Amino acid sequence: MSRLKELRNYVDAEINKIEDPDKRTSAIAHLYGVSLAATMIAKKRGFDPEIAAMAAMLHDLHAYKTGSYDDHAHKGAELAREILGELKLTDGAETDMICSAIYHHDDKLVTDSPMDEVLKDADVIDHCLKDASKAVKEKEQARFDKLCAEFGMKDEVSVNEV
């Protein structure tokens, strides 16, 4: 079994513990959506798509498990380190890269390491494209516009248009 598949099985089991079916569905859709976007972005930029997908699968797990987004990026990085240590899927450098991306993913206005940026951008892609009726968050607009340019998306959506 691939490392990503093993991690997804673990995450699926954790998400399936969420009692509210709408929250459970939302969690699955977001984690898998960000994972797919992270894979695409990492491949385009020449980074490890498997590590990007693994970071994406774990990036909001703490929030889903606890129901709280309070400092969820930092707490999520700690949880990811525990999970990766338990499952023994990554070496130290890979674990550090994944945890750094999760730790920084909520600060969309700051530029961090390349893999951190892959996760931030994947999160923004999922937020902005999963429901076209919702406005792009102001803190995500500049990043989304850059992604539209990078991927040749001509119909850029702005906060003012929606």
Please place each PLM-identified region on the residue numbering:
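Residues at secondary-structure transition points
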Residues: 25-29, 52, 67-71, 93, ...
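Short linear motifs at secondary-structure transitions and domain/linker junctions
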Residues: 28-32, 76-78, 92-95, 101-102
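An amphipathic alpha-helix signature
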Residues: 4-12, 35, 74-81, 99
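A contiguous binding-surface segment within folded domains or other stable secondary-structure elements
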Residues: 67-71, 77-85, 89-92
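Divalent metal-dependent phosphate-bond-processing catalytic cores, especially two-metal-ion Mg2+/Mn2+ enzymes
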Residues: 1-6, 19-47, 58, 86-89, ...
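Hydrophobic aliphatic residue packing
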Residues: 11, 34, 52, 98-102, ...
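His-Asp-centered metal-binding catalytic motifs of divalent-metal-dependent phosphohydrolases/nucleases
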Residues: 49-67, 72, 76, 97-106
